[in-house]
From Swiss-Prot:
Transit peptide: 1-17
Protein name: Pentatricopeptide repeat-containing protein At4g39952, mitochondrial
MF-aspect GO terms: RNA binding
Location of region: Type E motif: 703-775
Domain of life the protein comes from: Eukaryota
Lineage: Eukaryota, Viridiplantae, Streptophyta, Embryophyta, Tracheophyta
Record keywords, A-Z: Mitochondrion, Repeat, Transit peptide
Amino acid sequence: MLRRLLKPNLVVTLRKLSSSSASYVDRHISVILCDQSLSLESLRKHNALIITGGLSENIFVASKLISSYASYGKPNLSSRVFHLVTRRDIFLWNSIIKAHFSNGDYARSLCFFFSMLLSGQSPDHFTAPMVVSACAELLWFHVGTFVHGLVLKHGGFDRNTAVGASFVYFYSKCGFLQDACLVFDEMPDRDVVAWTAIISGHVQNGESEGGLGYLCKMHSAGSDVDKPNPRTLECGFQACSNLGALKEGRCLHGFAVKNGLASSKFVQSSMFSFYSKSGNPSEAYLSFRELGDEDMFSWTSIIASLARSGDMEESFDMFWEMQNKGMHPDGVVISCLINELGKMMLVPQGKAFHGFVIRHCFSLDSTVCNSLLSMYCKFELLSVAEKLFCRISEEGNKEAWNTMLKGYGKMKCHVKCIELFRKIQNLGIEIDSASATSVISSCSHIGAVLLGKSLHCYVVKTSLDLTISVVNSLIDLYGKMGDLTVAWRMFCEADTNVITWNAMIASYVHCEQSEKAIALFDRMVSENFKPSSITLVTLLMACVNTGSLERGQMIHRYITETEHEMNLSLSAALIDMYAKCGHLEKSRELFDAGNQKDAVCWNVMISGYGMHGDVESAIALFDQMEESDVKPTGPTFLALLSACTHAGLVEQGKKLFLKMHQYDVKPNLKHYSCLVDLLSRSGNLEEAESTVMSMPFSPDGVIWGTLLSSCMTHGEFEMGIRMAERAVASDPQNDGYYIMLANMYSAAGKWEEAERAREMMRESGVGKRAGHSVV
């Protein structure tokens, strides 16, 4: 059947050729098999003719067939041809090894290599590079070292440049960079392949600086054999990108242009990638235009580069251009734009782009949904973020849970953050280090001591990456808990950064150990850490706590001498420090010297005047604040009400309290406490009572105590009894309220009622807490 399908005359010809000289046969078959227009089907027909013609044992013919089948991606057919040959030489073995190696079947190529060794055939300088490279691709280190030993044992070709380059590549690929360098240094001659292998090895193993060093050595060698090729330059640009070495990258760009390599697609692509990652959107844009046939990766890179530089308008222009050219965006480029919109807090644009995502059905892409969730968390649009989270969290999206956890932390929703973490634990979802930091910080803010300690155990138990952020949040947690021993131990064991120092200094200040905080600052400076504004603000708080004007002045001099940036927070802290340490003139001098003043600066200056009893100056400054179009805040009115209380300015205080509504400032418990104190001290007890009854929340002990004390002072015992009874009803477990009620009854001469109040206290199981002295 086969013979009927094939040309009979070709079979006859082959039979005649088989009796002719071997060299003539080889040449004739070679001409047939080297025909590039030969299809796979024709190749198989010729193979059949060769078998029927009795030439399957011909090594040269077999090697040609093996190579031809390999070029069609059919190494399995190459193996069939190989197995028909009984007497095999090194040329045939190399052919079958190459057939599988070139098609990515590295394990099979190594199997043939070991079969070759078992047959007694020794490898040559063509075999070794393929076998070693196969070991590199499979990361079979021990097999590769065995081959290295075999090469050294046989000798003769271990000093071959191709063999040496393959071993450099192998050791680099397996992560043994030092061994790769030893092999490279021992090579008597090095070609561009060897140089590229050692440069690439350094870059791939995170030693980009060393890679650039070898590139410079290669350039210094100066011979044509050592001249960098496009692949070498690609590695060089990658190294520059990893190091952020803009100057060196530009030099490499110039070298590529000078040596005619800039037109290479390898060079253009790597050059574009370098400029994109190095934060040079203009040069990245020019490189992008030189690419010509842009793919989705290059479009994504240029759009991301422009977006990261803050040029969102140009970034979106490129996004629309990409679509006009027939390129359909994928989830990666969509997510990239969403992430940058979130970072830049472009809320209207972010919402509009969300509409584009929905219209083009990208809302089903988990990567896009996670980016949208992150964006809305950054916008602090809690309701939208929660709605989106409810939709995507049902799909078991681990990243979404972590994003929402971090979002709650960012939006100061500490209770929700902790509740979500508990739910995550119940579902068995893993959290990342950033999420752990958010939960630990939430525990610090709401005083969840036990949960905070449990989180520390969780971090250790789950072998979570103990990043510096996690350590800093734990130091802050233990500092706020008052456990300075653990906080200090973690500080000493950590790879500290400025934030770590800040956390430890803040812990000392929080625990009222300001002297230790100041001493730690001195150590921080001596160890060449540059304090941040947060460090200095915290230290000024320590100076306030200790009343140390001298130390505060030293910190002020440090700020001036080091030319530290004087931002609004630091300026406000200095004004506050001088005011609270008794140097009101200096405080006002700094206030007047400030070019920009936010509400905090105005507040601390007003508070300073109130603290020193200069109510007129405080109110005058408030009037200036209104004229400067700075909106007063809650602390502004609290400082003013406190000043009016101490000065007894009832009408002025009432006007200020009513003025809060004008600025949409909702009074809190402290504002009401000041107003009640102001009214009570002036004898306006009925108005004070009316104020307490109209409060939108329950009074605390301070308000009840203020009101009852004034009732006692002004002899309003009936009102005092009425207020005390309400206080007891509001909090039956507060021993102070029972005592105040009993005292009020006693003052009114109602001894039986006083005794009954004490009896109620005993029946409720409330005992009077023992007094203590702070001396």
